[in-house]
Amino acid sequence: MQNVASWLLALVVAVVQGELLPGKSAPALLWSYKLSEGIQEYQLAYNMTTVLPAPEFNAIALELLDHCNSHAYVFVNQPGLRLEDFDYEDAWTVLPNYLSRSSSALRFEQVEVSPSNVFENLIAHTKRRCDVQREIILRAEQTNQFEPYIDAQSRIIQVHFSPLPGDGRNERPSREDVLADHDQRLRRILGRLPSPAVTVIYTSLEPADRLSASPPRAGIFPEIFEHESRRIEYERNDRDLQVNRYFPSHHPKMEPIEEVELSLLDPKFIQSNLKLLKLIAVSAIGSLTWQLYSLFSPKLPVATPKGTAKRQKGQKKLVKLATAQAAKQAEEVKLEVSQQEKED
């Protein structure tokens, strides 16, 4: 609040001393994609019916740049720009879009234009404060030939558009057409930057006299700057929020089976599975019958390996005995035959 109080005091002193020259002012827009805390106070304290002194504008711009929260610092000079040019609503399609998406944005309808190039001081300060080593300068037709870059080094970009034509009806192209063309060129420049994190100062270093000496009745883009959300500061572009990770929805290859409670007493179930039920019943009855027969039938001796060996040994003895008896009987028969032959 001390900064705002000192700024208001300097503004009053400048008005009293008559240091603000009527007609030598230009509108100015300042915005940053990331939040620059403390900047919004100047917007709330500003009165658009007064002219903002050049030193105060310079101090506000320096405070905005001191945050060093951007990958590119763009200084746009539109020679001949005046407050009434923002009444051409059809000419401005890009600038309002960038302003509405920015976390910090300021508008000053009337800023005293310093005799010296205010950009020089701001650019030198940015290079030193934010350690920016590279600078790109685009003049007039070069603004339509901006080549994109893909490295991560911060840059200062100066954009100097060609002066705006007069207000005559016979002017070709018209003032509105030139504003619309420059608006699209700015879109191509900002759209080709590798990061949306930019800080932009848009004004005129060569102002034109206002069409009316009366104080402005409407501010620049009131639908943006007079929105209730602009009364508080918050980060509008925080991409590191706790966002739920994406999981694809489940798409089964087969349709889910309907949940149907089956019952043995269901007539449809019995009719469609009659053969299977009969087979189950026959198997169950047969198994029960076998169990009952095994339970009540006389028990037979169970053969063991040892009993089997004894039985085999006894069988061998019987075979040998039978063989011996047969041999003995054969010998006896042989003796009887031989005796009969002798008697004959």
Swiss-Prot record:
Signal peptide (from-to): 1-18
Family: Belongs to the BIG1 family.
InterPro entries per UniProt: Big1
Protein role: Required for normal beta-1,6-glucan synthesis.
Glycosylated residues, chain numbering: 47
Transmembrane segments: 276-296
Cellular component, GO, one term: endoplasmic reticulum membrane
Name by which UniProt lists this protein: Protein BIG1
Intervals, Cytoplasmic compartment: 297-344
Topology of this chain in the membrane: Single-pass type I membrane protein
Domain of life of the organism encoding this protein: Eukaryota
Gene Ontology biological-process entries: (1->6)-beta-D-glucan biosynthetic process; cell wall organization; vacuolar proton-transporting V-type ATPase complex assembly
Lumenal side: 19-275
